[in-house]
Amino acid sequence: MATRIDYYESLEVSRTASQDELKKAFRKQAMRYHPDRNPGDDAAEQKFKEINEAYDVLKDEQKRAAYDRYGHDAFEGGMGGMGGGFGGGFAGAGGLGDIFDQMFGDMMGGRRDGGRRTGADVQVQVEITLMEAFTGVTKDVEVRTRVTCEACHGSGSADPKAGSSTCPTCHGAGKVRAQQGFFLVERPCPTCHGSGRTVANPCKVCHGTGTEAKTETISIDIPAGVEDGTRIRMAGKGEAGGEGVQPGDLYVHISVLSHDIFQRDGANIYCRVPLRMTQAALGTEVEVPVVDGGRSKVRIPAGTQTGETFRLRGKGFSVLRSSARGDMYIQVSVETPSHLTKRQRELLEEFEKEAGDDHAKGSPENSGFFAKVRDFFEGR
């Protein structure tokens, strides 16, 4: 069986693309792969056919709604009731893919909770700063989704009195079954597209689906302590499913931006603090910023080396669903000056002359190094 293309991937657009975005993408791809521009190129010709097929479906709101919910199955005929319209083996069907659709079909609309039909789930990604992740934040996000049709109030019918009737093909189940080899496979009903209802006089706005495409602004409450990659589920905020069908869910994927000063590791925060070599040698007290916006003083003892770390308890990141906080770790980096005044050079030369070989004894790292050198020459 030939691999079926994803219409959105074929046009290189997102699943929430507007009609204008679809049109622009189609024109761009059509110009690129048009046979007149690629004479004798079979691959380009095949691609041109694919993008035309994709745009033909996605430019029609009714076809797009069916495709978003059921994929290519929405346009396959020959699916009658139990056992009807199928050949032997897996011919004319989605094969094992249909079985996996039943298991994992929630993300594209389907059934949950023991058979309850739902609209398609919607996925969005939201970027927040490290500070917003620390305090928590409410974000307003524009979501391209399908909502209950305002014209027919979700009935799908142009005549409110007539309404809809039980689908004669699936008898209201929204799906049909067929025996395929050893498997009993369920697929969306081709007559009602899974709604279980049919409309004699379809609404002119939604064409009988009971839903229409719309861009909505949704407020998302992001709690303090969320980590990069956190997924938040907002029940019932996904796509509407038409008459008698519960809406899907909205899944918000959180992306936490990196920070110029702080690096986060779970509930702990790390901050690199540069010191002059004189500060590290003599000892000092430095003020460092903390993630809640304040400052804390840190005592640096004399003789501090690059890489040494000092901990500030309770000054780290907020913990999700808790009032606790992690710790903050100050990582010291001793910097050597690259530009010296004449006086500074004189002082350092004087220091070096005064220190002499004793310098090695005063530095743990150097003393270890010179001890190893001495042992090497003495044959130890």
From Swiss-Prot:
Intervals holding CXXCXGXG motif repeats: 149-156, 167-174, 189-196, 203-210
Subunit structure as annotated in this protein's UniProt entry: Homodimer.
NCBIfam families referenced in this protein's UniProt entry, alphabetically: DnaJ_bact (TIGR02349), PRK10767.1 (NF008035)
Domain-related comment: The J domain is necessary and sufficient to stimulate DnaK ATPase activity. Zinc center 1 plays an important role in the autonomous, DnaK-independent chaperone activity of DnaJ. Zinc center 2 is essential for interaction with DnaK and for DnaJ activity.
Binding site for Zn(2+) 2: C167, C170, C189, C192
Pfam families for this protein: DnaJ (PF00226), DnaJ_C (PF01556), DnaJ_CXXCXGXG (PF00684)
Superkingdom classification of source: Bacteria
Biological-process GO terms, alphabetical: chaperone cofactor-dependent protein refolding; DNA replication; protein refolding; response to heat
Keywords: Chaperone, Cytoplasm, DNA replication, Metal-binding, Repeat, Stress response, Zinc, Zinc-finger
InterPro entries: DnaJ, DnaJ_C, DnaJ_domain, DnaJ_domain_CS, HSP40/DnaJ_pept-bd, HSP_DnaJ_Cys-rich_dom, HSP_DnaJ_Cys-rich_dom_sf, J_dom_sf
Stated name of the protein: Chaperone protein DnaJ
Predominant location: cytoplasm
Cofactor annotation remark: Binds 2 Zn(2+) ions per monomer.
Residue span(s) of domain J: 6-71
Record localization: Cytoplasm
Organism the protein comes from: Gluconobacter oxydans (strain 621H) (Gluconobacter suboxydans)
Protein task: Participates actively in the response to hyperosmotic and heat shock by preventing the aggregation of stress-denatured proteins and by disaggregating proteins, also in an autonomous, DnaK-independent fashion. Unfolded proteins bind initially to DnaJ; upon interaction with the DnaJ-bound protein, DnaK hydrolyzes its bound ATP, resulting in the formation of a stable complex. GrpE releases ADP from DnaK; ATP binding to DnaK triggers the release of the substrate protein, thus completing the reaction cycle.
Cofactor: Zn(2+)
Chain intervals annotated as zinc finger (CR-type): 136-215
Xref: Gene3D superfamilies: 6.20.20.10, DnaJ domain (1.10.287.110), Urease metallochaperone UreE, N-terminal domain (2.60.260.20)
Family to which the UniProt record says this protein belongs: Belongs to the DnaJ family.
Gene Ontology CC terms, in alphabetical order: cytoplasm
Gene for this chain: dnaJ
